[in-house]
Design a protein with these regions (language model features):
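N-terminal Sec/SRP start-transfer signal
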Residues: 1-21, 229
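Hydrophobic alpha-helical transmembrane segments of multi-pass membrane transport/permease proteins
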Residues: 14-40, 49-65, 156-171, 208-218
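A structural motif at transmembrane helix-loop-helix junctions in multipass membrane proteins
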Residues: 22, 130-168
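Hydrophobic alpha-helical transmembrane segments of multi-pass membrane transport proteins
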Residues: 46-111
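Short alpha-helical transmembrane interface motifs in multi-pass membrane proteins
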Residues: 51, 59-64, 94-95, 120-128, ...
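Alpha-helical transmembrane segments and their short interhelical loops
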Residues: 89-90, 97-147
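Junction motif at the cytosolic side of a transmembrane helix
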Residues: 142, 210-231
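Terminal transmembrane helical anchor/hairpin motif
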Residues: 168-215, 219
Length: 231
C-alpha cells in the first residue's frame, strides 16, 4: 500500500507537468459549465449538456490517460526500473489507477452539481459514472499493456474512445445507430443518467449491459496482463 501511494503521488506530479493529460481531465467538465450557462434553447431537455459531456468524459479521459501513462512508461523502461525497486505490478496499477479514477471522479462531481442532483440522486449519479470510468480505465490498461510503443497505443486508443464517447450522441439522431449503441456501456449509462434526470425507473437491461461490460473489460485486462505483462 505504501508503494501504491508513492506511485499515486508520482503520477500527480507527472500529470501536473503534462498539459495534454491535464486537459483530458478538465476539458469536458469545463465545456459543460460553459454550455449549461451560455446556451438556452426552447424545449431542450433539462441539463442536456451535462449528460452529453459526462458521457464523453467517462468515455475518453480514463481510457486515453490510462493508455498514455502505461504505454509511455513501458516505452521508456520506467516500469522495469520501478519493479527492480520492489514495486509490484499490482501496486503500480493500484497507484496509477487510483489517481486516474480520483481525477475523473472530480469531474463527475462537477457534472453532478451542474445537473442539480441532490441526496441519493447525487450518489446514484456518481456510482453510475464510477462504473463507466472503471470500464474505460480497464480498456485503456488493456491497450497500454498490449502495445509496444506509445504511438501504437494512441493509434488504437483514439478510435476506441471516439466510439464509446460519441456513440450515445449519434444514437440520438439515428435509429439504426441507436440499435447498435444499445450494446455499448456508454449508451446505457447515458440512458441511466437520462432516467435519473427525468425521474423514471431504472431499466434492468441498462444495468445488465454495464455489468457485463465491466466483467468483460476485467477479463480482457487479466488476459492482456498474463500474456504481455507490464515490463
Amino acid at each position: 500500500m505504501k508503494n501504491s501511494m508513492i506511485i499515486f503521488r508520482k503520477q500527480v506530479k507527472d500529470t501536473g507537468k503534462n498539459i495534454a493529460l491535464c486537459i483530458q481531465f478538465v476539458m469536458f467538465p469545463m465545456m459543460a459549465v460553459i454550455m449549461e450557462n451560455a446556451i438556452k434553447i426552447d424545449n431542450m431537455p433539462p441539463h442536456f449538456f451535462v449528460g452529453m459531456f459526462a458521457i464523453m468524459h467517462l468515455g475518453m479521459a480514463p481510457l486515453n490517460v490510462m493508455t498514455a501513462v502505461i504505454s509511455e512508461e513501458k516505452e521508456k523502461n520506467t516500469l522495469r526500473m520501478l519493479f527492480f525497486g520492489n514495486v509490484t505490478p499490482a501496486e503500480y496499477l493500484l497507484g496509477i489507477g487510483g489517481f486516474i479514477f480520483s481525477a475523473c471522479m472530480v469531474g463527475a462531481v462537477v457534472f453532478g452539481i451542474l445537473g442539480g442532483y441532490r441526496g441519493m440522486q447525487f450518489i446514484y449519479f456518481l456510482l453510475t459514472m464510477a462504473a463507466g470510468i472503471c470500464v474505460s480505465m480497464l480498456l485503456g490498461a488493456v491497450i497500454g499493456i498490449r502495445c509496444k510503443s506509445q504511438i501504437a497505443a494512441t493509434t488504437i486508443a483514439t478510435p476506441v474512445m471516439m466510439i464509446f464517447a460519441f456513440l450515445p450522441m449519434l444514437a440520438m439522431f439515428n435509429d439504426g445507430i441507436a440499435k447498435v449503441a444499445d450494446f455499448a456501456y456508454s449508451q446505457q449509462i447515458q440512458l441511466l443518467i437520462n432516467g435519473l434526470t427525468a425521474g423514471t425507473e431504472v431499466k434492468p437491461e441498462s444495468l445488465l449491459v454495464v455489468a457485463v461490460s465491466l466483467v468483460a473489460a476485467t477479463g480482457l485486462f487479466i488476459h492482456a496482463y498474463r500474456r504481455c505483462g507490464l515490463a
